[in-house]
């Protein structure tokens, strides 16, 4: 069976003032992919993620499979009203995403159970640890039942235990059939989670390979230099 493209980005270029953030990037996201966008700071990872999600204007073409229309989710860092409870943050987010009012309570309960936060549902979001806040962000995304999930550095600034919890949730989402595109500075995380690795340098895609191939001895050019770099192998 041929892979089903959910999202196609063609010839996308993005400029912020004097900075060329993306240069003629083309990328296809297939159903079931878990794509890790990797590269040095300023390589274009976050800009590409936002172009894929339709959050930044670009000069190219973005085509979304009709079956995925309206079923996307983006995990932001600290996307909460901190004075509201975990429960109310989740209900508001699901309502804004278009979940029918009659389904809000059940959907919120299911999402909290999925990420292990049921016992904290009445606690203010500001009282959560960093790892718990990220699990709340994942609950908000999971509750929308997205075909496509976008994550920007989902474990940045988390301690090792919290990172493992978040990674376990993402592995579970992928097993459930969710298609995921994630930017990360952590090559170890990309190797553990992703099915494809896309390496960016200077706003251009320099490599787009299955994970096993990307981390093999066959890798060439700038991508190989990146994987061998001192910072690249600071596996967290």
List where the protein language model places each region.
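Catalytic Walker B motif of ABC-type/P-loop ATPase nucleotide-binding domains
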Residues: 149-152
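The feature captures the beta-strand-to-loop junction immediately N-terminal to the Walker
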Residues: 38-40
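Helix-to-loop junction immediately C-terminal to a conserved catalytic motif
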Residues: 53
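Helix N-cap at the start of a conserved alpha-helix in ABC-type nucleotide-binding domains
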Residues: 160-162
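Conserved ABC ATPase "signature" region
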Residues: 102-120
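H-loop/switch region of ABC-family ATPase nucleotide-binding domains
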Residues: 184-185
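Conserved ABC ATPase signature
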Residues: 124-128, 132
């Amino acid at each position: 069976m041929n892979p089903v493209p959910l999202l196609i980005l063609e010839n996308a270029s993005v400029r912020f003032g004097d900075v060329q953030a993306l240069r003629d990037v083309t990328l296809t996201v297939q159903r079931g992919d878990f794509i890790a966008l990797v590269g040095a700071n300023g390589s274009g990872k976050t800009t590409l993620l936002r172009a894929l999600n339709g959050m930044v204007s670009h000069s190219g073409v973005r085509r979304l499979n009709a079956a995925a229309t309206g079923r996307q989710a983006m995990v932001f860092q600290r996307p909460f009203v901190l004075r509201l409870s975990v429960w109310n943050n989740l209900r508001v987010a699901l309502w804004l995403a278009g979940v029918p009012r009659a389904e809000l309570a059940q959907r919120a309960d299911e999402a909290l159970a999925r990420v292990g936060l049921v016992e904290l549902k009445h606690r203010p979001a500001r009282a959560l640890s960093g790892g718990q806040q990220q699990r709340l962000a994942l609950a908000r995304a999971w509750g929308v039942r997205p075909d496509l999930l976008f994550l920007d550095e989902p474990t940045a600034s988390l301690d090792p235990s919290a990172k493992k919890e978040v990674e376990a949730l993402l592995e579970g989402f992928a097993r459930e059939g969710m298609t995921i595109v994630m930017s990360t500075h952590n090559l170890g995380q990309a190797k553990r989670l992703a099915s494809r690795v896309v390496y960016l340098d200077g706003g251009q895609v320099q490599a787009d390979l299955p994970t096993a191939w990307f981390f093999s001895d066959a890798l060439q050019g700038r991508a190989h230099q990146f994987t061998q770099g001192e910072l690249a192998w600071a596996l967290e």
